[in-house]
Amino acid sequence: MSLTSSIRDKLYCMAEKKISEERRESTTQTAEELKVPSMEKELEELRREFFKFMEFCIPPKEVRDEVMKNLYNIPLSILKAFRTILDYEIKVLEERVKETERKPKSRRIAVE
């Protein structure tokens, strides 16, 4: 059986189309595969830059415990300061009350 030239040409064109489509698919797949690592690399670079920036904000490990202890003690220190101020104000008010209680009202003595 011999194929006519027109059928042979059609089969050849179909084969070329199929091959070109497979190539396109493979290139898009490889392009997608290439994009994923590049995104991972970009993400890794962003992480590194973020940690470099945060190094200035976060104290070193040796000091971190002391800083955390001080952060926990801040509310206690504030409350102690308020207590001291309140104690002083109470003392001042108590002294004023005692002074008013001590002083008897002065009476005028009638001179004849």
Curated annotation (Swiss-Prot):
Coiled coil among keywords: yes
Recorded superkingdom: Bacteria
Keywords in alphabetical order: Coiled coil
Regions annotated as coiled coil: 15-53, 86-103
Record protein name field: Uncharacterized protein aq_1201
Species this chain originates from: Aquifex aeolicus (strain VF5)
Lineage: Bacteria, Pseudomonadati, Aquificota, Aquificia, Aquificales
